[in-house]
């Protein structure tokens, strides 16, 4: 309970978020909870299953009876309160049938569900579903063929409307008539019978019948069904049941994608709260692209997206900045690539790779975060580097143009309108909808550039932290890069850790026994720190560094202007090996690879 209270930041019993927190807690206990050891035969059982078992046992023992009760008032979409009536001789779909349930579970097991954690809810729904009314006495709908007093209830047939889409256009253009028989549907949807017999019995052209069958085979099975989480206990599970009852296994659904709802400023949209934003006015004020992106970037699939107008304005500003860059950088020519150019092009490949992987898993928020925020951060750093070296736009236009070209392609599925405009600004004559999703260019990965820029970023951050803590305003900052023998030690440790050897004693012994690294016997603390440095590094970074040799002094010299400008100080750079270095406080001795020492005065 405390975890949930902290998660929702609840301070008092009157907090309106308390109800939502309670629902979250009960839901978590119900779907994830296990029965305690003191519950006898139910011990260790899932709470959801235990509830049904307790009910079943109590009914069998005549210790309980069933009372039908509405959990809350039922209202029509027009606002009128509904009266629930029990009907006699009503028709039901028998979702209780154990064989049908078993097939439904088989279908779920063979399907891709996104996100995968929704699988538990589908299985649970299949287990508890029982007979469900499939017909009613009033309202719009199709008459039940074998009992015309009844009208087919919408959720009983609408869950296979994808199949109807195949023939809908032929109904609308009057190619089909009302004299369709069972043989027609058996052929078009199931492949039973012959096109010739169907055409003859229904007075249709052979060409139309064959065309509908081919189109059905093209579009079926359903590759992906997208809907809200609130439809898992009904529409989406009926979708599974009804498909497996009608179609062969080869035509069963392949994927279901479930999404959350959209909240407004952290609250559910409702008329009573007065927080509904009409779509037309929102688009008119903020643009369709900004609204689309702000909702998509707010949450992953199963989470509720918290829509705020401040977020929309922020997204719009970011999109307009990208648009401005597209107007500014149109030349394709690239001059000789500098260190920062190689870095931004390498970073671009990482973003393409990560975004593509995220999109393949329908991690839309993660994808947009890469394209919007990560690339913004990268470009801001790149332009800082450019400004510090006083490079003009002509010298970077080709590189920036490559970045924009790729970025706009990745942005287009989410913000199609402004992406089309930007694509044209970049000199493309055809629509961006005809452009391919960008591929990773392996030749532009530059791991030396990646690590070099990370080294500079970390140097700047370390210096800023020291200044913040000490509250000094240095006029001069001395940077000391690690001695060459320390690099030998670092590489040796890195190789051993990469091989799975992390024991300090084993590493120390290997270093002391190697003439190139034996100096470490006087510096065991440094070895411990290097081991910690390497183990705190992500695995992919370790693997890159095994193959790298960085000249730290050269890297720092290249960024001297930027770091000095950011810190408002003169930067003086030495190698620890330099006998003529200025080192009044003997700081150089603590320098380690990728961890330069600093002295300020």
Tell where the protein language model's regions lie, with residue ranges.
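Charged, glycine/proline-rich intrinsically disordered loops and linkers
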Residues: 2-41, 176-213, 497-547
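Residue patterns forming the tRNA-binding/recognition surfaces of aminoacyl-tRNA synthetases
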Residues: 1-151, 158, 267, 278-311, ...
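Acidic, turn-prone loop/beta-hairpin segments
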Residues: 334-356, 369, 373-462, 480
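Structured, non-catalytic alpha/beta "coupling" segments that mediate domain-domain communication
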Residues: 53-95, 311-326, 409-425, 577-599
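Alpha-helical recognition segments enriched in aromatics with Gly/Pro capping
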Residues: 1, 123-303
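C-terminal low-complexity, glycine/proline- and small-hydrophobic-enriched intrinsically disordered tails
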Residues: 309, 313, 430-601
């Amino acid at each position: 309970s405390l975890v949930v209270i902290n998660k929702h930041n609840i301070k008092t019993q009157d907090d309106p978020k308390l109800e939502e927190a309670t629902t979250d807690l009960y839901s978590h206990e119900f779907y994830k909870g296990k029965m305690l050891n003191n519950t006898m035969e139910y011990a260790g059982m899932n709470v959801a299953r235990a509830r049904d078992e307790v009910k079943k046992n109590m009914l069998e023992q005549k210790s309980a009876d069933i009372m039908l009760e509405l959990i809350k008032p039922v209202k029509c979409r027009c606002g009128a309160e509904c009266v629930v009536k029990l009907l006699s001789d009503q028709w039901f779909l028998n979702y209780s049938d154990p064989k049908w349930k078993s097939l439904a579970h088989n279908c779920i097991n063979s399907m891709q569900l996104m996100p995968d954690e929704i699988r538990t809810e589908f299985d649970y729904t299949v287990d508890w579903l029982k007979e469900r009314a499939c017909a009613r006495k009033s309202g719009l709908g199709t008459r039940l063929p074998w009992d015309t007093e009844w009208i087919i209830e919408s959720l009983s047939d609408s869950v296979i409307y994808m199949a109807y889409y195949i023939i809908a256009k032929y109904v609308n253009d009057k190619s089909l008539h009302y004299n369709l028989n069972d043989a027609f549907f058996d052929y078009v949807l199931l492949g039973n019978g012959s096109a010739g017999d169907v055409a003859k019995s229904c007075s249709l052209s052979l060409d139309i019948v064959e065309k509908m069958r081919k189109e059905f085979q093209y579009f079926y099975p359903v590759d992906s069904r997208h809907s809200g989480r609130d439809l898992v206990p009904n529409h989406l599970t009926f979708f599974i049941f009804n498909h497996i009852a009608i179609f062969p296994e080869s035509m069963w659904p392949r994927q279901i994608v479930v999404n959350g709802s959209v909240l407004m400023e952290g609250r559910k949209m409702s008329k009573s709260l007065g927080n509904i934003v009409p779509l037309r006015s929102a688009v008119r004020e903020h643009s369709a692209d900004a609204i689309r992106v702000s909702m998509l970037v707010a949450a992953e699939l199963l989470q509720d997206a918290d829509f705020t107008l401040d977020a929309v304005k922020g997204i719009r500003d970011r999109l307009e900045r990208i648009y401005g860059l597209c107007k500014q950088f149109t030349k394709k020519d690239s001059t000789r690539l500098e260190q920062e150019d190689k870095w931004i092009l390498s970073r671009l490949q990482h973003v393409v790779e990560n975004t593509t992987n995220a999109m393949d898993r329908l991690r839309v928020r993660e994808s947009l975060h890469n394209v919007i925020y990560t690339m913004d951060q990268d470009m801001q750093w790149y332009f800082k580097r450019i400004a510090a070296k006083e490079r003009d736009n002509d010298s970077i236009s080709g590189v920036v143009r490559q970045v924009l070209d790729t970025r706009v392609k990745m942005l287009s599925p989410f913000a199609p309108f402004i992406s089309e405009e930007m694509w044209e600004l970049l000199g493309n004559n055809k629509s961006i909808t005809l452009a391919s999703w960008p591929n990773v260019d392996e030749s532009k990965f530059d791991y030396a550039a990646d690590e070099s820029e990370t080294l500079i970023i970390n140097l700047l951050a370390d210096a800023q932290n020291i200044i913040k803590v000490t509250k000094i305003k240095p006029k001069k900052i001395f940077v000391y890069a690690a001695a060459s023998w320390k690099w030998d030690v670092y590489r040796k440790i890195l190789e051993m850790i990469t091989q799975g050897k992390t024991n300090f004693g084993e590493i120390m012994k290997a270093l002391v026994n190697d003439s190139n690294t034996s100096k470490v016997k006087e510096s065991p603390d440094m070895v411990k720190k290097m081991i910690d440095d390497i183990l705190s590094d992500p695995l992919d970074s370790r693997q890159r560094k095994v193959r790298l040799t960085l000249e730290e002094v050269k890297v720092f010299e290249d960024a001297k202007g930027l770091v000095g400008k950011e810190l408002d100080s003169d930067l003086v750079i030495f190698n620890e090996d330099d006998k003529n270095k200025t080192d009044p406080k003997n700081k150089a001795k603590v320098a380690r690879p990728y961890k330069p020492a600093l002295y300020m005065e």
